[in-house]
A protein has these predicted regions:
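Bacterial N-terminal signal peptides that target proteins for export
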Residues: 1-7
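Hydrophobic helical h-region of N-terminal Sec-dependent signal peptides
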Residues: 7-15
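C-terminal motif of bacterial Sec signal peptides marking the signal peptidase cleavage site
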Residues: 17-20
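Beta-rich carbohydrate-recognition and catalytic domains
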Residues: 22-190, 194-219
Length: 219
């Protein structure tokens, strides 16, 4: 059983005022010679993006970066946004691999949307870890129910596993629900995972309780 801790979100506002003046003595800005002063990558992708990855069709939503200790590269999962998206089933998880942040290899669709009546009809943001004990990748993600009834959860944290980061299998018995722990059943999303030096895995989830935003930690 996972243990949870309540971490209320503290919102802090910082107000700064600035004044500006100008006269004829202001320095004249000149165009920088970036070719002579900077080193940068030239993308080799056939579709020709220069810095930010964009799929050939649609757009990238909510990038979920993960360093792959097996392949020794970075995997960036993202929500594939077609615009327009289907009414009920949208935002499957796609991915790319990169070693330098400029040259990308498309991994295609990794985790598909569920059926119209399933909990993950629409997929929301998640996070990934690699467990060397069983040599599996675990991606925890948000399952968004299409038109949930009053007794159903609009958002649930779900999980899929893969031995090679290519073929993913959803665990249809794992459903982490906010109301099980006293939190909102409709706002329970965006799991973020990390491992501390003691080897313990942690998962942070954004949710609400009594009308206030919370970050919940599971270990």
């Amino acid at each position: 059983m996972m243990k949870n801790m309540i971490l209320p979100i503290a919102f802090t506002a910082l107000i700064a005022s600035m004044t500006a003046c100008s006269d004829e003595t202001d320095p004249i800005l000149t165009q920088k010679d970036w070719d002579g002063t900077a080193t940068y990558f030239q993308s080799s992708d056939e579709h020709g993006f220069s810095m930010y990855y964009k799929p050939q069709v649609g757009f990238v939503g909510d990038p979920m970066p993960f360093y792959d200790p097996v392949a020794k590269d970075f995997k960036v999962m993202y929500l594939q946004d077609y615009r327009p998206n289907p009414e009920a089933t949208y935002h499957p998880i796609f991915g790319v691999a990169t070693k330098d942040g400029a040259t990308y290899e498309s991994l295609g669709e990794l985790i598909s949307c569920g059926g119209r009546d399933e909990q993950d009809a629409a997929i929301g943001t998640g996070g990934t870890i690699y467990n060397p004990a069983d040599k599996l990748y675990y991606t925890f993600y948000t399952g968004n129910k299409f038109k949930p009834s009053s007794d159903q959860n609009a958002q649930v944290v779900m999980v899929a596993t893969s031995p090679d980061f290519k073929t993913w299998t959803k665990n249809r018995t794992f459903y982490l629900k906010g109301d099980t722990y006293g939190y909102d059943k409709n706002d329970f999303r965006d799991p973020f995972l990390f491992q501390t030096e003691d080897g313990v895995y942690h998962m942070l989830i954004a949710t609400r309780k009594n009308g206030k935003g919370h970050i919940v930690e599971f270990t």
